[in-house]
C-alpha cells in the first residue's frame, strides 16, 4: 500500500521548465542575476513538489520574443508537445516587456498545454478577475521601457542644446 501512495504522488507531480532571463542593465541595477533567479525558482519547485525538466538561460531584452533560447524552446515544445506542465519565471517582466506579444505567447503556450507562471506574481488564469492583474503585470514593464526611452531622448536633446552631444 505504501508504494501505491508514492506512485500516485509521482503520477500527479507537476513538471516545470524554468526560464531565467536577464539583460545586462537589469542584472546590475535590480539584482536579477541568473543565479538568484535560478535559486528562487528551484526552491519554489522543491516546496511545491514540482520536478524540473529543463532550465533555460537567456541574456536578451524582453521587448520581443525574438530571443535565441526562447525560439529554441518553442521549437522543442512544438516538436514534443506537453513535456512540461509549467514554464516558470520570477516575475512577468522576465517573460516579456511587451503586453501584446505576451498575450499572444501565453495563448500559444496554453494551446501547447503549458501554463506560464511568475512565481513572485502568481495568477490563476482560470479565474476571470485575474485577467485584470495580468494586464497590469504585463503593461507595467512596457510602460517602464517606454518611459526609459523618452528619458533617453530628452537627455540627448538637452545634451545637444548644451553642446555635449
Ranges and model annotations:
Residues 1-159:
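Short, structured surface patches at the beginning of a domain
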Amino acid at each position: 500500500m505504501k508504494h501505491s501512495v508514492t506512485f500516485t504522488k509521482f503520477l500527479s507531480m507537476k513538471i516545470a521548465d524554468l526560464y531565467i532571463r536577464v539583460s545586462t542593465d537589469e542584472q546590475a541595477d535590480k539584482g536579477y542575476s541568473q543565479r538568484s533567479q535560478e535559486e528562487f525558482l528551484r526552491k519554489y519547485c522543491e516546496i511545491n513538489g514540482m520536478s524540473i525538466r529543463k532550465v533555460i538561460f537567456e541574456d536578451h531584452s524582453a521587448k520581443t520574443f525574438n530571443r535565441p533560447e526562447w525560439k529554441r524552446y518553442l521549437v522543442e515544445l512544438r516538436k514534443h508537445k506537453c513535456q512540461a506542465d509549467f514554464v516558470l519565471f520570477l516575475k512577468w517582466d522576465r517573460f516579456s516587456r511587451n503586453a501584446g506579444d505576451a498575450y499572444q505567447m501565453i495563448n500559444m503556450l496554453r494551446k501547447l498545454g503549458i501554463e506560464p507562471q511568475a512565481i513572485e506574481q502568481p495568477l490563476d488564469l482560470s479565474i476571470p478577475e485575474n485577467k485584470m492583474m495580468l494586464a497590469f503585470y504585463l503593461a507595467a514593464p512596457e510602460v517602464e521601457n517606454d518611459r526609459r526611452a523618452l528619458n533617453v531622448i530628452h537627455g540627448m536633446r538637452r545634451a545637444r542644446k548644451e553642446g555635449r552631444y
